[in-house]
């Protein structure tokens, strides 16, 4: 499809349904082919798409480059950079739409490629908000995976924290000793099982005004949670009566 703005270009991209065997291989490159006026130029142009979208195959055709441009110049070319930005924005927009319109199909896609896309969260780029828009995580209070916005909307806490715990699998994390206090207080905790999350969460630190906070590192203060606050605001005679009943 056309990618807009002043540059004349078209791109035909595909969302794969299964992982390529070399997805995590260090030498894995993107699978995009670049054409200029329908003449093939290169299929080894790393700057055409971010590494964390390397699983997206397709073709890009532009009229804004010379047919005899060298590969070295292509790697740091303003037109290529514009095309890369436009392609990336379009892919992320389509993924956000897929999540909204076909959640089951998106979930299958996310299980295969979510960890790769989240590599983009520990890179310096302008796409973090778009990635967060559709990124989903396991959590302690629901069986299905949730977005960070869902966490905030459904389980907002007065500490302005997004609590998480990381480990090898969901079951072990749910049975972790550190989880007991949070379960007792009905505080939702993200269950982080993708190794990539342990890289970007400490770096990102915040989502909107909420801090990412590991429940296994340092002291987590829950004393001012809403339930505790409600109890502390009760009149003294009510507290005495409750204590008597206990």
For each predicted feature, which ranges?
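Conserved GHKL (Bergerat-fold) ATPase module
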Residues: 1, 5-246
């Amino acid at each position: 499809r056309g990618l807009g703005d002043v540059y004349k270009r078209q791109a035909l991209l595909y969302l794969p349904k299964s992982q390529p065997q070399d997805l995590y291989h260090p030498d894995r490159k993107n699978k995009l082919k670049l054409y200029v006026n329908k003449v093939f130029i290169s299929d080894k142009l790393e700057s055409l798409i971010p590494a964390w979208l390397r699983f997206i195959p397709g073709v890009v055709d532009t009229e804004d480059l010379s047919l005899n441009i060298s590969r070295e110049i292509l790697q740091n070319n303003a037109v290529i950079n514009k095309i890369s930005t436009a392609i990336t924005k379009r892919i992320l927009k389509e993924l956000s739409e897929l999540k909204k319109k076909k959640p089951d199909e998106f979930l299958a896609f996310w299980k295969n490629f979510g960890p790769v896309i989240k590599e983009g969260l520990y890179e310096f780029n302008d796409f973090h908000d778009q990635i967060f828009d559709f990124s989903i995580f396991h959590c302690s209070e629901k069986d299905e995976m949730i977005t960070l916005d869902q966490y905030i909307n459904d389980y907002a806490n007065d500490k302005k924290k997004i609590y998480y715990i990381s480990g090898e699998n969901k079951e072990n994390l749910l049975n972790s000793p550190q989880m007991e206090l949070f379960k007792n207080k009905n505080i939702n905790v993200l269950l982080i099982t993708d190794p990539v999350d342990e890289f970007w969460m400490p770096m990102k630190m915040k989502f909107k005004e909420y801090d990412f906070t590991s429940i296994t590192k340092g002291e987590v203060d829950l004393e001012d949670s809403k339930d505790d606050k409600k109890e502390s605001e009760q009149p003294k005679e009510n507290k005495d009566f409750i204590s008597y009943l206990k």
